[in-house]
Design a protein with these regions (language model features):
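Loop/helix-junction capping segments adjacent to catalytic residues or to phosphate/diphosphate-binding pockets
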Residues: 13, 36, 60
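Local sequence-structure signature of Cys/Sec-based thiol-disulfide redox active-site neighborhoods
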Residues: 1-28
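Non-catalytic, surface beta->alpha helical segment in thiol-disulfide oxidoreductase systems
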Residues: 55-67
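Residue-level recognition of oxygen-bearing side chains
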Residues: 15, 37, 65
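Residues at the C-termini of beta-strands that transition into short coil/loop
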Residues: 8, 31-33, 63
Length: 67
């Protein structure tokens, strides 16, 4: 399953979600602006932008990497 870490106001987060929906791929969207633990995880990984996307335990990258 894909995990998309993003924020509520993020064009590329929405694009990633729409792409996964279009391809009928299962995903979970995690809003780091509402979940402090998720935000801490992303910050500790060194990421400064969203979306950050994983497939199972494998990091994919951002939207451009997903495409």
């Amino acid at each position: 399953m894909y995990k998309v870490y993003g924020t509520r106001i993020c064009l590329y987060c929405d694009k990633a979600e729409n792409l996964l929906k279009t391809k009928d791929l299962p995903f979970e969207k995690i809003y780091i602006d509402e979940d402090d633990d998720a935000k801490d995880y992303i910050v500790k990984q060194g990421f400064k932008t969203v979306p950050q996307i994983w497939l199972d335990d494998n990091w994919i990258g951002g939207y451009d990497d997903l495409v």
